[in-house]
Amino acid sequence: MSVPTTSRSLPSLVGVLALALAGPAPARAGGDQEVTVPPRVQAQLLAAVASFQTNINLAPDGAVQILVLIKDHDADSERVAHQLTAALGDMKKIMRRPHREIIEPFAGGAALALTCRERGISVVYVAPGLGGVLPEIAQALRGSAVLTVGGVAAFVSRGVVLGFDLVSGRAEMLFNPTQMRALNAHFPASIFQLMRITE
C-alpha cells in the first residue's frame, strides 16, 4: 500500500547529515563501481531522506521494506549489501515504523516490478555491480512510487533517484529529480537544498 506521510523538518535531515559526515574512511569497490561513502553512512542518509517521501509504499502490515539488489556471485556487491543491511538493522525504526531489509540478486525488470508491487517495497537499493542494468531497473519501476537508491555515485545520472559521493572528504547526497518524477516519488522542494542535483 502507498500512504501519505508527514514530512520531517529540514533541520532534522541537516542533523543526520552532520552526524554522517563524522564517519570513517570510505569503503571502496573496484573500477567504475566505486563506493566512496561507507555503507553505514549511506544507511543513515537513506533512512533520513526516505522519511521525507510523502507517498512512500508500505508493506501490508505498515512496515517500511527496503529491497537491496545485488549482482549474483559478485563479492563486492554482496559485501556492500550486507554492510548496509547491518547498519539499517541497528535502527529501531524508520519513519517511526518497523522496517525490514531483504537482499536479493537482480533477476530482471519484470521480476523486480512484480516483487515491488506484491510486497509493497518502499525502497530499492542498487548495490555495486549492477550499473549495466540501471535502465532496466528504472523502466521497471516507472510510476511505482518506489524510491531508488544507488550505492555508487555514478548510478544517479544513470537512473536512480538518490546516491552518495565523497567530495573533499565530505559526504554529499546526489538527487535526480527527473527520475524522481518518472517513478512518481513525491518529495518537498525544500529537500533539494541539501542535494547536489544530477540529471
PLM-predicted stretches and their roles:
Residues S2-T5, L17, G23-E199:
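Short hydrophobic alpha-helices and adjacent helix-cap/hinge residues
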Residues R8-G15:
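Sec-dependent signal peptide recognition
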